[in-house]
Amino acid sequence: MKIAIVLLAIIALVAASSISKHEVKIADKEFLAKQKFLFEIVYRVEDPLMFEEWIKMGKTFTFDKSGYTHFDMYMEKFYEAYKYGAILPKGEFFYYAKNWETFQRNVAFARMHFNEGMFVYALTLAVIHRDDFQGLILPSIHEIFPQYFFNSKFVYEAEKFDYDVWSKYIMYEKEYKDILYKDYSTFYKNHDNHHYYYFTKDFKTYQWWKMMGLGEHWYSEDRFMLRDNMNKYNKDSKYLEIFEGTKMFFMPVDYTRDIEFFNKESVLSYFTEDVGLNTYWYYLNMDYAFILDGKTFGLNKDRRGEYWLYNVRQLLSRYYMERLTHGYGEIPHFSFLNTIEHGYDSQLVYNNGVGFSYRKNYYEVESYGKFSYYYKVMDFFNRLDEIITKGVYVTYEGKTIDLRKPESIEYIGSIMQGNVDTFDNYFFKYRYMFAHMYFGDVNTHDFEVFPHIFLNYETMMRDPMFYMFYKKIASVYFQFFNYVKPYTHEELLFPGVTIKDVKVSELVTYFDLVDFDVTNLMNDEMTFVDGQFVWDKTLLARQMRLNHKPFDFDFVIESDKSHKVVIRTFLGPKYDEFGRVITLTENRQNFMEIDSFIYTLKSGVNDFKRLSKDFYWTVEDRTTYNELYKYVMLALQGKYDFPLDISEPHCGFPDRLVLPHGWYKGMPMQFFFYIAPYTASYGPFSTYDSTYACGIGSGVRHIDEMPFGYPFDREIDEYEFFVPNMYFKDVKIYHQDTFDKYYGKKYENFGHFDYSYYH
């Protein structure tokens, strides 16, 4: 009951309204003050609030109904639960505040008294969904809760970081290295007839620091934070000004390793544990949170159910391509009756010091978890199979749903997510959540539970079992479309339009190094000057990650007249793990849509270029927490114009993960291009600024009104499918080993970070 109150009452965070259009503009003082509050209220959110201004403000909580635009039964129940102490310690939710002052006071109160996890969850929903918060942002979730993204070894080192102790340690370490590294290669040479230095490449690639002679501890960063666009920032005088006097420290951080048991899946941990990938899934489930009803928050206008299920398919396709890179092939089939050969230990630790549960090798799905949830989930899938097979469903209220209409996939998507828009809550509500609770071995009556990665959106994608289970979820989508007729040749044909050629530039992936701001893990004393917080120390997690070089498409399209069109681009495999060509009928499930854009064709031959950095659903690295806070403070002093588009929208997929790893000699893949008339009844992104906002609930955040994944949404009849306005292009994806220079000879500056790594 307690959890039900919490989940339903969190809806009170946000007020329903449409999203109005905002020009990209410079923030005014009022906006900056709000942004400063949001940044400070989540600083070290697991520690007591240290900002005196917000402590004073948070001493009271507004329970007066007149202070809210909406006050329902769940808010009443929450208030009663709060009075009797029947809520999670330190945090549940805050209400529909009529104005910023009431909201701010309630947020400060919640920050001091309520559970920090629920507090951040609720605050995130408010910032995303309230129209009066347009442009306001929170730090990325991996900056608020770094312990959900980095292993326990790193977290412990960050939590106990002390500058004074570090200063003494680094002095002793220098004396040690001056002796050890004088002739490192000679020291190891000919021992057991091996020259160990030349075997540094035997380390997993993502243990890059060993090749530079670094250890897993803190190093002073005297130059700059590492990221793709660091050269641009290094030339910005304002950027250099805000970091003057700031001490930065980095520590190498690994992905999960094979420690106690063999797990071949760990070779993919650089992908499954990628910070950007897990952040994307987290925000997708914040944008379309299952507890928010579509009518109130406009989510139905975005086709929330279909879009959520489409994203599941996209992620599965991307994961499958990464598996092919390593020769693994199909994602294993999931069944509650099966034994999963390879276990998983996330090596994560909760902020209270309790480690996350792990899954052993030969995990018997049926033998773990609460059996009441097991039967609920099994019943859920059986019921779904029944109604899809029948093609019609009569709800508890007597409403008839025709499941042979393609647009009914919206209902199926809502059922699979278990959101409150499910067309029959009596039978289907929260079954998806129950499955995760079964995997996490918890139930709604537990007051204390062990942390488990399946209980957090930001952690669940780390486990390979996630993809197995979600493949089962996606199978419902394909089962639904088994009963929908394939597109005919006439439906796919765009008369008068022919794709003559598409030239693709070289596709190259590589591993780069990046710094993540993890200052929220620090426990040292905060610095205040005249009551104002001074961010004088920053901790950085330095990690290797997959990236790709920019690439582009050169289109050559012939048109009989001027047409406004939508051009879709998909990436998919060519061969399976055994080198066999995958038929298009089977392969349609494996194609990932990487771009869609509107273009006006002129009569005749159209020759134009599309750059990978312009893909509409991808984003580059977001500006870090530290940087954003310093920019805000500089703007409040009148020394900087703070643009609302200073950071990337939270809802984008990481641009650097568009391409799979590939092979050194080239991995065969294929692009698919398809042109269709633009027929949408709206202008995409027309009611909001997509440079910094996501337009959740606007109804105009998608390119057009065609089904997601079109034309691969339905089964394919290869006799009907091929038309002149589509084009397949065979390509190869090459992987460049950026660590190759460390293999052949000794790194001259061994024991120090190599800043020439990027050159």
Curated annotation (Swiss-Prot):
Keyword Secreted set for record: yes
Gene Ontology CC: extracellular region
One function term, GO molecular function aspect: nutrient reservoir activity
Natural source organism: Calliphora vicina
SUPFAM superfamilies per the UniProt record, alphabetical: Di-copper centre-containing domain (SSF48056), E set domains (SSF81296), Hemocyanin, N-terminal domain (SSF48050)
Name used for this protein in its record: Arylphorin subunit A4
Keyword presence, Cell inner membrane: no
Keyword terms: Secreted, Signal, Storage protein
Function: Arylphorin is a larval storage protein (LSP) which may serve as a storage protein used primarily as a source of aromatic amino acids for protein synthesis during metamorphosis. It is a constituent of the sclerotizing system of the cuticle, and serves as a carrier for ecdysteroid hormone.
PROSITE patterns: HEMOCYANIN_2
InterPro entries associated with the record: Di-copper_centre_dom_sf, Hemocyanin/hexamerin, Hemocyanin/hexamerin_mid_dom, Hemocyanin_C, Hemocyanin_C_sf, Hemocyanin_N, Hemocyanin_N_sf, Ig_E-set
Subcellular location: Secreted, Extracellular space
